[in-house]
Amino acid sequence: MAIAFRASGPIDTVTANLGLLAELPGTFIGSGFNLISRPAKQHNKPFFLELNATHEILQFMAIGGDIPNRGSGQNDINLHGVRYLQQVSDCVEHSQIHIEPGLWLHVPETSDPQAGESYVRQALIPHGDSVLAQSTFFTTVNGGPQIAPVASTPFTGQIPDLNTPPATPITDPAYLAPFTDTPLPTECLPQGLNAAQTIKNPALVLQAAIAGQNIIKTDVISISSAPAGGIVNIPFVVQNANASRIDAIFWIETVRRPNGQAFIQLQYVQRVILDFIGIHWPHISVATLVKQ
């Protein structure tokens, strides 16, 4: 029996169609920080604040050809993209805390619907969650990234954008105490971080990681599940800690060493909103990864 395969195009042709994803194929390794408030009914508490210094391996592989989407209101389009596997472990205990396969896609401009070029991230989370997030902003800038604060304070009411503080933060001292009293992990984080300030704004870990670097170019992709897409969860997750929204910014940086050589570095900040006991709880992850 004959088996037909779709042949991959030349690598320069494949990467030329990836847009801002072109530098991703390969393996990125580095470290980061994870903050999550999770339910703790089993221990007779409303929640538990968990902090992890992390070690991460993020592997990207280019999809070797066109991904045709057939049109009925306009001509067909071709998507292009990369598949990825993200593996995150606790840097102190060396236990795995996250694994995520997924896709990044580069979508061309369309007329039906009328929409500009965009990027899409699809992810599978082994807690029973499927994610679809689309770009809200992307650009290329000279120099390094502008990393704005990302608030970890739990809140009620409307979910703000990633870099906007919540309008109605929780003020109960019993709920806020872990966000000021919990020590940071003792290993794998940049030196000199203030614990309370870092818990309040985990993006400080990203700023500390690139202090003193000569970043000459940065590709920026901001994504969210809010405008289009979303998160689909199994019923247990919906009832106990519903993942309702994801927002993230990825910075793909070209860094120049003092000897003139350059390397590629990936930084990201991601916020997933978990909803339980009537409160929105930001689950924030950051990392700085170097392409191998």
Predicted regions and their residues:
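Soluble ligand-binding/transfer domains with enclosed cavities or grooves
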Residues: A2-Q292
